[in-house]
Amino acid sequence: VGLTASMLTAAEPAAAGTPETWTSTFQGSDGVTYSATNHLVAPAGGPGRQWMLVWSGPAKQPAPDFLTVIDATPDSPTYGKVANTVTVGPNNGNEPHHMQYVWHKGDRIYAGGIMGDTTFVFDAKALPALTIAGVNTAADTPCGTLPDAYQVLGDGTAYGTYMGGPNVTGPCTYTNGQVRVGNGAAGSPGEIVRIGKDGRTLAEIPAATEAGEDPAQCGNVPALPAATCANPHGIAVREDLNVMVASDFAEARNFMTPDSALKENLARQTVRVFDITKRDDPVLKSVSKVADGPRGAQEPRAFFRESRVVMETALTNRPGHKGAFVSSMAGGAVFYTPDITAPAPQWKEVFDDTTAYRTFQGDRQITGSGDNGSWLAVSPDDRFLFHTVMGQSVPYGKPLEQTTGMVYVLDIQKLLAAGNGAKCSVDELAEASRGGRERDCPELVSTVPIRDVSSGGPHWGAMDNFKRGADGVYRETTQVSRIAVANYFVAGSFGGGGDHRVCMFDLDRRGRVTLDRSFRDENTGKPCVGFNRASWPHGDYGDAQPHGVLFVVSDGVVRR
């Protein structure tokens, strides 16, 4: 296994208007040589600056998957313009999904291809250029498939959630010698994988309990000898607490098409907490469950009750806080526990997406039910909770204007200040649309509709955790002033495709969000960068599907 970089155009400068291209390669454990080819254009020049990485795939095959590098420096003359596209090869059709939630100086980029069962690792020291530094292939993770989300640790390695079951049906042995029986790729149980900076598998970690879980709640198709809800999607880590949290999504292969039957017992309600004292051998400490709220009793289809499809989790950050949040994709609700280190965390619903809808949508038939809540993040200073909602409301048929997507911000300071004595609980029907009545309930600070009436909406997002000083140097900040979201989920899924825009939002000190209209598409001149375009620096491949987004900074102008 090794890395090789070759300058393909070093002999002579690129012609005017022609991207400068160069390729780095990496030989995977499977013997395949993987490549990353940069296509640098004019906005890539000049001094170091801030960038946005967008991990995307083509809308039509065959065409390469690629990382887009966009100028994210507001006062730059090329703000919002594509500076580079980094195509990966030789395999296409990976279905680019998530990168890590937050980037820190020196971190490598972990980018997952959920359908290709591959994690690509990139070195970002030469931004806006990237070099391939590692690849984790399907053969490297025999006990899990569908790589989803990543958290990078202080040593530069990463934990990744692999939502689907083993490559092959039957028993699978994890790194620590434990064995679980699975029903195959994209099935159950999923796992956690610790990945090295070179893409190597450091540890495959079982997410399922050995004894199994409630078979009535944890359906598996086909059934397993020990039923499991272990289909981890979201992941959050507090190294100071030696804790890792993963939220369970669904047995994914049963929901690959828009007309898939929405079976209640395949919609997960569970959250898994691991002790990561031994980084290569985390111990599953608890499996807890979120419960339906007051709106659920009125929803005839259990799949759309508040507790269903627990897609995302987010941890608080400050030393005095141990709280954790999770959100449900099909249920449209946010839940909280004040102490994630407790032996058996107790979750309470603290916010219903219906309340956010009421700020701009008067139709009282529209609720959080089926609204496809997605990205969830706590600001580094523990003041705000950010949440995106795709807005495709399946119970109401086609995605229409009234079920538009949105991004909203909650002030969570009172809730966290209450500690273990937190009282907030959305348990009355009126609270679903007005917010919790307890004094420590989160306060809805801001809601911005994101009008996407295609088959999807705003799914993933990222916080800008950097601030530029008067000396031109960037340093990390706890006060987030910008967030970005991407309007795309997964091709062919019940969540839909979205309109393929990436939008930037400004955040004031009170947490109020406004669309950054200066972050414009270089072709249309409209706010948000559109990924529906005929040409890219790497060729005329047409529309692309942006999923993961991440703020990064040129190595020479960022300090820890």
Task: Please report, for each region that a protein language model flagged, where it lies by residue.
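Structural signature of eukaryotic scaffold interfaces centered on beta-propeller domains
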Residues: P19-G48, E95-G106, L146-D155, G164-G165, ...
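Short, conserved, GDST-rich strand-edge loop motifs in beta-rich repeat architectures
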Residues: P47-Q61, G160-G187, A246-R268, H387-T404, ...
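Short loop/turn segments immediately following beta-strands, especially the blade-tip
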Residues: V69-T78, V121-T131, R194-L202, L262, ...
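Surface-exposed loop and turn segments in beta-propeller and other repeat-based domains
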Residues: K81-P96, G134-C143, R200-A230, V283-R308, ...
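Asp-box/WD-like beta-propeller blade repeats and closely related beta-sheet repeat scaffolds
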Residues: A124-E239, S247-S260, Q269, R295-F304
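Beta-propeller domains
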Residues: L224-G421
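Blade-loop segments of beta-propeller domains
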Residues: Y79-L153
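Loop/turn-rich, solvent-exposed surfaces of beta-rich toroidal or solenoidal domains
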Residues: A324, I366-C503
